């Protein structure tokens, strides 16, 4: 499996804002000429001139700048879920916290030389934000330029395919059952360096599939093509899947939600992970 050349093509770095807006269908060449004339006559920046003429919005300019600097985020017209706040509102306070978490994980866990590229996102119960954190962490890692893969290993209640609006026809379950291949890894078109492997069809035996040697082999293969691999998991207090995944990933990040998570459940899951020889990276 070698998705690198197909999934990691950066094309807008160094291009002018006008060219990006034309390619995106936000400007016609004739409108761009009007903007350039005003820019030259008034000594204005291209974006300011375009907005003054009413030809584009401030959001259009921000979008073009994000592509110019290889820091992509999505417009409100995108088909992906608005739960991906890191993709829609990359400068909001909640995303600043996600970037701070990203920095801590880069310092404390992810290390290519030590072959630490994979991290399971775990929590004891449903509704604690595992899928939200996994998805948005994947976005902010990709915005850093890290080749990022998000695997939906919650084969009980998969969500990532709906968040990213990707096909769930082939995914992790088919791959572990020997019926899937590289096509199960899907690029997220508008986000550089981000790919998703959805859960696939809900199988009758998720725990058995995850316990097979093929899962470890799959992670090893994917680690050759990605810098960061994040794995969404089922509720740890309900199923043993999370512990199995965390051991295969070697490390786990515990998610807790204020006024929802119970300390006793968090401590119990943490103890189970450590006993199973998984490293608890943080919470």
State what each model feature region is.
Residues 2-42, 52-283:
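P-loop NTP-binding module
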Residues 45-46:
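Short, charged amphipathic recognition helices of the HTH superfamily
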């Amino acid at each position: 499996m070698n998705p690198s050349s197909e999934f990691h093509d950066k094309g807008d770095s160094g291009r002018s804002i006008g060219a990006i807006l034309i390619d995106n269908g936000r400007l016609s060449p004739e409108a761009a000429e009007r903007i350039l004339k005003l820019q030259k006559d008034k000594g204005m920046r291209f974006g300011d001139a375009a907005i003054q003429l009413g030809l584009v919005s401030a959001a259009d300019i921000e979008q073009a700048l994000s592509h110019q600097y290889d820091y992509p985020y999505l417009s409100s017209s995108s088909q992906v879920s608005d739960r991906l706040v890191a993709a829609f509102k990359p400068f909001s306070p909640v995303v600043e916290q996600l970037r701070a978490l990203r920095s801590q994980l880069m310092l404390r866990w992810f290390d290519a030389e030590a072959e630490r590229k994979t991290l399971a996102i775990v929590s004891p119960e449903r509704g604690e934000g595992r899928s939200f954190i996994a998805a948005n962490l994947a976005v902010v890692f990709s915005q850093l330029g890290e080749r990022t893969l998000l695997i939906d290993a919650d084969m009980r209640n998969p969500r990532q395919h709906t968040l990213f609006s990707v096909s769930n026809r082939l995914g992790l379950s088919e791959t572990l059952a020997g019926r899937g291949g590289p096509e199960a890894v899907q690029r997220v078109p508008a986000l550089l360096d981000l790919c998703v492997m959805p859960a696939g069809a809900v199988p009758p035996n998720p725990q058995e599939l995850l316990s097979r040697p093929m899962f470890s082999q799959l992670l090893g293969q994917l680690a050759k093509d990605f810098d960061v691999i994040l794995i969404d998991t089922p509720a740890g207090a309900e199923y043993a899947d999370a512990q199995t995944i965390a051991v295969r990933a070697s490390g786990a990040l515990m998610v807790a939600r204020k006024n929802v998570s119970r300390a006793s459940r968090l401590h119990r899951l943490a103890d189970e992970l450590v006993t199973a020889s998984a490293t608890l990276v943080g919470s």
